[in-house]
Design a protein with these regions (language model features):
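General marker for long, soluble alpha-helical cores
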Residues: 1-182
């Protein structure tokens, strides 16, 4: 549905979540991986249909396709701002997971065999920060009124890993500014 009729994807996803809430995270991951352009609509539909499923679905989307993070965060923040903090936390948990960065590096090396080890190291070093910035931007776009609160929540989550936190301050601020420049 997401590929053939993207405009209807959100409505269909909402109905699917209501019919089978246990499949929401798997559906979200599949869409993020295969039809990233529909990630925002699907994420918003899941959050609207059952806000309690939003964080798990957001984490699954982040794992499946980090490039869909901003759209997914925006969709969820717009549909259910009351769970935006949980959503951001779940997405940041994935972004900050060293195993996830390792998987990202392996996939990048396979897809780009001409990368030097230094270039690959730089990609991995920037991966988590870029992902966190995308999450922040998505949250701010989804609901500019919660941007300030979300920045604080995201910084608290970043402090769970103080070694990485210093890199996230600028990414969170930059993402929020890009998403809600007012």
């Amino acid at each position: 549905v997401a590929q053939m009729a993207p405009g209807a994807a959100g409505d269909v996803a909402g109905a699917m979540v209501e019919a089978n809430p246990d499949g929401a995270a798997e559906m979200a991951a599949t869409v993020a991986e295969n039809v990233p352009g529909a990630a925002g609509a699907i994420a918003g539909a899941i959050a609207e249909a059952d806000p309690a499923l939003a964080a798990e679905a957001a984490g699954a989307m982040m794992e499946a396709n980090p490039a869909a993070a901003s759209a997914a965060a925006a969709g969820m923040a717009n549909a259910a701002p009351e769970v935006a903090g949980d959503v951001a936390g779940a997405m940041m948990e994935v972004a900050m997971d060293p195993e996830f960065a390792t998987d990202f590096a392996e996939n990048a090396a396979t897809a780009n065999p001409d990368l030097t080890p230094d270039q690959l190291d730089a990609l991995v070093d920037n991966f988590a920060g870029n992902a966190v910035g995308a999450i922040a931007q998505g949250m701010a776009v989804g609901d500019p009124d919660i941007a300030g609160d979300m920045a604080g929540i995201m910084m608290d989550a970043a402090m769970a890993n103080p070694d990485m936190a210093e890199n996230f301050v600028g990414e969170i601020a930059g993402g929020m500014a890009a998403g809600a420049p007012q």
